[in-house]
């Protein structure tokens, strides 16, 4: 790194700090804190302990967000000031030190930028993910299983826990469908970027003529809802079916009809759960999955009219293409982010892609 590159880095960091300011709005946070302090000075305020606890929680959140912005801005300002002094005094030793610290400074600011982008109401929730293969039989079913493994590996890398809810084996290979919960801090905030249709182009391992095939699979992501979020589902709007569990379920599978499938007529949403021996527990989990999907659908309608974008799996609401032949490239169609490290991506190294989507979405929103 040289002086010019470091100067350009500082400009980039300044832009990132401005992004953070747009999202956190420090002026508004300061006003909120002032209002809360005025509230706390009212002698009657503490009489309502429930309200006082809620306000205290909001105060801590505002303080934390404001501190995040202040620390970030200070870090960048300090680097700029030190750089200008070193340049004016031709202090090569200090400049070398700044250049050495540049990658970690950039990494830290990028991390802060991403974290503040995950400040949505449900971003801190666990994520319920359903993967469904598109048309094409074995090809797309195998592609669905590759995506499932990719998310398992990604979860491992991030230290998230995974709980399997439903698993349907494919006829020859792969899976007919899978549903699982990723549990961890900001799991939904990160995973929501994966919502959409994923396209694979490769030389088929199932084709004796070694022809190139295109396969599709849909990934649906919704937040695991707290019990206090009330979503009413009328009995007349759903059908509940029982069936024997199959696939990766353990010794009890196929012995009793403990698996549950719920069909929601107004939306056409179908959810399945077979992860427990108890039909009652599977039904409760399936209802939770349905509520989460209905909630996510409503969010999408409000935010971007996504109800218009839903289409059959194929060339519809496609978000990403994975080309393994004749060349190797994974490309996100929303951000145009591309990488030739297809094996790394399919092994769960997708943070860079996810972060590019979060930055893109946040910048668009602001």
From Swiss-Prot:
GO annotations of cellular component type: cytoplasm
Pfam family membership, one: RF-1
InterPro entries listed in its UniProt record: PCRF (IPR005139), Pep_chain_release_fac_I (IPR000352), Pep_chain_release_fac_I_sf (IPR045853), PrfB (IPR004374)
A GO term, aspect molecular function: translation release factor activity, codon specific
Subcellular location: Cytoplasm
Protein's UniProt keywords contain Protein biosynthesis: yes
Gene3D superfamilies associated with the record: 3.30.160.20, 3.30.70.1660, Release factor (1.20.58.410)
UniProt PTM: Methylated by PrmC. Methylation increases the termination efficiency of RF2.
Modified residues (N5-methylglutamine): 251
Keywords tagged on the record: Cytoplasm, Methylation, Protein biosynthesis
PANTHER family: CLASS I PEPTIDE CHAIN RELEASE FACTOR, PEPTIDE CHAIN RELEASE FACTOR 2
Record-stated family: Belongs to the prokaryotic/mitochondrial release factor family.
The protein's role, per its UniProt record: Peptide chain release factor 2 directs the termination of translation in response to the peptide chain termination codons UGA and UAA.
Protein name: Peptide chain release factor 2
């Amino acid at each position: 790194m040289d002086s010019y590159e470091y100067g350009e880095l500082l400009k980039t960091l300044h832009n990132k700090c401005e992004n953070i300011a747009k999202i956190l709005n420090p002026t508004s946070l300061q006003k909120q804190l002032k209002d809360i302090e005025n509230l706390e000075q009212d002698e009657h305020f503490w009489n309502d302990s429930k309200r006082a606890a809620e306000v205290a929680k909001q105060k801590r959140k505002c303080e934390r967000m404001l501190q995040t912005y202040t620390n970030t801005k200070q870090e960048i300002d300090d680097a700029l000031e030190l750089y200008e002094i070193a340049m004016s005094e031709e202090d090569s030793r200090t400049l070398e030190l700044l250049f050495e610290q540049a990658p970690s400074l950039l990494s830290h600011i990028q991390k802060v930028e991403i974290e503040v982008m995950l400040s949505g109401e449900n971003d801190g929730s666990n994520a319920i993910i359903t993967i469904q293969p598109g048309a094409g039989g074995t090809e797309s079913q195998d592609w669905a299983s590759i995506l499932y493994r990719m998310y398992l590996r990604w979860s491992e890398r991030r230290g998230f826990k995974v709980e399997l809810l439903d698993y349907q084996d494919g006829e020859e290979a792969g899976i007919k469908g899978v549903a699982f919960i990723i549990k961890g801090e900001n799991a939904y905030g990160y995973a929501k970027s994966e919502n959409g249709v994923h396209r694979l182009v490769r030389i088929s391992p199932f084709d004796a003529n070694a022809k190139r095939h295109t396969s599709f699979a849909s990934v649906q992501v919704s937040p695991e809802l707290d019990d206090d979020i009330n979503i009413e589902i009328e009995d007349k709007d759903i059908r509940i079916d029982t069936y024997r569990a199959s696939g990766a379920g353990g010794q009890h599978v196929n012995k009793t009809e403990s698996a549950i499938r719920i069909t929601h007529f107004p939306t056409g949403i179908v959810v399945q759960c077979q992860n427990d021996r108890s039909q009652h527990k599977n039904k409760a989990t399936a209802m939770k999955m349905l509520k989460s999907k209905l909630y996510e659908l409503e969010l999408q309608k409000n935010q971007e009219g996504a109800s218009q974008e839903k289409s059959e799996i194929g060339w519809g609401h496609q978000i990403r293409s994975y080309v393994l032949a004749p060349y190797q490239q994974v490309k996100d169609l929303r951000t145009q982010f591309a990488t030739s490290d297809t094996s790394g991506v399919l092994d769960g190294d997708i943070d860079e892609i996810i972060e590019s989507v979060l930055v893109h979405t946040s910048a668009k929103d602001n």
